[in-house]
Curated annotation (Swiss-Prot):
This is Probable kinetochore protein SPC24. GO terms for cellular component: Ndc80 complex; nucleus. Its main location: nucleus. Residues 24-124 form a coiled coil. It comes from Kluyveromyces lactis (strain ATCC 8585 / CBS 2359 / DSM 70799 / NBRC 1267 / NRRL Y-1140 / WM37) (Yeast). The gene is SPC24.
Length: 189
């Protein structure tokens, strides 16, 4: 207890336990480190705040773009639906299928008609050759050959000979020469 009663001794003993200069130096260094850490933390906080602002700005721009795209998509969807409703696509598809069937039927009908014409021509040719064999084998004269050639020429020009008049078959069968003329049609050629 004597130590407690002697304050000077107590101070000396306490001083001997601590190195005050070293502790003061350590405290100054700790304060300096704390200031540097505080400054570094403030810089990092400022950097992070700026980065957050940039990211929030980018996020807001992206959200605006997304909203615009959603709105555009909805408008296009409604426009497509309107066009589909106006066009009535299923009915158009049915109409197109029906037209294709009709075209195929017409094609078949035309093909059958062509086959009938070919068969009829073959029969007529066979009948003509049979008739030619049955007719007396008289030599065909030069005038007859000329007349046949003229008739073939008229036919190739879509012109027909009817009651001694040339008829233009391309224009509603009207006469090529006046009906009042009494000259021979063969003379016109």
């Amino acid at each position: 207890m004597s130590r407690l009663n002697d304050p000077v001794e107590l101070l000396q003993q306490t001083r001997s336990n601590f190195i005050i200069e070293s502790d003061v130096s350590n405290i100054k260094e700790i304060k300096s480190n704390m200031r540097q850490l505080t400054k570094l933390m403030a810089e990092k906080q400022t950097h992070h705040n700026e980065l957050m602002k940039q990211l929030q700005s980018q996020l807001q721009r992206q959200q605006t773009k997304v909203q615009a795209l959603k709105k555009n998509f909805q408008e296009q969807t409604s426009q497509v639906k309107r066009v589909e409703d106006e066009l009535n696509i299923p009915k158009l598809q049915q109409d197109i299928d029906k037209l294709v069937q009709e075209i195929n039927q017409l094609r078949d009908t035309i093909q059958e008609g062509i086959q009938k014409v070919v068969e009829t021509q073959k029969q007529l040719l066979n009948d003509d050759t049979d008739a030619a064999h049955t007719i007396d084998e008289e030599p065909i004269g030069k005038d007859d050959k000329i007349r046949v050639l003229k008739l073939k020429l008229f036919h190739s020009l879509d012109v027909a000979l009817y009651n001694d008049q040339l008829l233009d078959l391309r224009n509603e069968a009207r006469p090529l020469s006046s009906s009042s003329s009494s000259h021979n049609i063969w003379d016109e050629l």
